Each structure stands twice: as structure tokens, then as C-alpha cells.
Curated annotation (Swiss-Prot):
Chain spans, region Disordered: 43-78
Source organism: Rhodopseudomonas palustris (strain TIE-1)
TM spans (from-to): 1-21
Designated name of the protein: Sec-independent protein translocase protein TatA
Pfam families listed in its UniProt record: TatA_B_E
UniProt GO MF annotations: protein transmembrane transporter activity
HAMAP family: TatA_E
Membrane topology: Single-pass membrane protein
The keyword Repressor is annotated on this UniProt entry: no
A single GO cellular-component term on record: TAT protein transport complex
Compartments where found: Cell inner membrane
Gene name in the database record: tatA
Function: Part of the twin-arginine translocation (Tat) system that transports large folded proteins containing a characteristic twin-arginine motif in their signal peptide across membranes. TatA could form the protein-conducting channel of the Tat system.
Length: 78
């Protein structure tokens, strides 16, 4: 009783077709396809802008005068 037979699925599909009609379902599927295409195009545009962007610059670590290293903490300066 918990599983649906083929006749249940046929009735469900018939009701959906009656409610939405053939034109609305095809319009809906067209909108979904257009959304997927625009999403893929957006992903490709992001990859192109990432390639065109400037390379990442690294910051050189230099110690400032008066700064002590962590290993020098507690030792006496000579």
C-alpha cells in the first residue's frame, strides 16, 4: 500500500498536464534551460576575469628596529 503503481503515476501526470497545460510546462522547461546557460556563462566569465587579474603580490617580512624575535625573549642582550 505504501508503493505507487504505474496507474498512480499515470493519474498524477494526467492531473499535472490538465492543471498546467502543455504550453506552460514547455515554457517552464525553456526558462530552466536558459537559467542553466546563463549560470554556465557566468562561471566562464569569472574564470576569464581571474586570468586577467594582477598576480598576487607577496609582502617581504622585515623586522623593524627595536623588535625582538620570539626566540630572544628571556635571553640577555650582550
Amino acid at each position: 500500500m505504501g508503493s505507487l503503481s504505474i496507474w498512480h503515476w499515470i493519474v498524477v501526470i494526467a492531473v499535472v498536464l490538465l492543471l498546467f497545460g502543455r504550453g506552460k510546462i514547455s515554457d517552464l522547461m525553456g526558462d530552466v534551460a536558459q537559467g542553466i546557460k546563463s549560470f554556465k556563462k557566468g562561471l566562464q566569465d569569472d574564470e576569464k576575469t581571474a586570468e586577467k587579474s594582477e598576480p598576487v603580490k607577496s609582502i617581504d617580512h622585515t623586522s623593524t628596529p627595536g623588535a625582538t624575535n620570539r626566540t630572544d625573549v628571556g635571553s640577555k642582550a650582550v
